[in-house]
Amino acid sequence: VESFLYQSGPACRIYLLADGSNCPAEDFLSQAAYLHPDEFAKLTKLLDHSCDHGLPKNKQKVNTLGDGLFEFKTIGGLRLIWFWDANRIILCTHGFLKKRQTTPSGELATAAKWKKAYETAKSANKVRFIEDPP
């Protein structure tokens, strides 16, 4: 498992998880920038704020999903799922455009799979933190 640095600041560092050439969070962010530029700008501002000042205490922007998973969210429906690691590291699994009130179970399962893969790789000392974007 690789993790690519996406953003960094005094409050935390945000990494995107990847497995070889597969980096779902980066794919999501690239698509969001192209297909939903206004919402992507809001998400980018939220990530900037989180790195510089810490997570907002507003459930409209950051929400817990259970099992150690969280989401950055915009009003327009962009969701970026992540979890914490030591040393104020945020690891993003993937993102999606939410269209219903509840988070689809398939999205939660995908995030849980990435989290488990990361934890397994970390316990085997097989995680690479890469400071350059994917």
What are these regions (language model features)?
Residues 1-77, 86-90, 96-134:
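Basic, Lys/Arg-enriched alpha-helical interface segments
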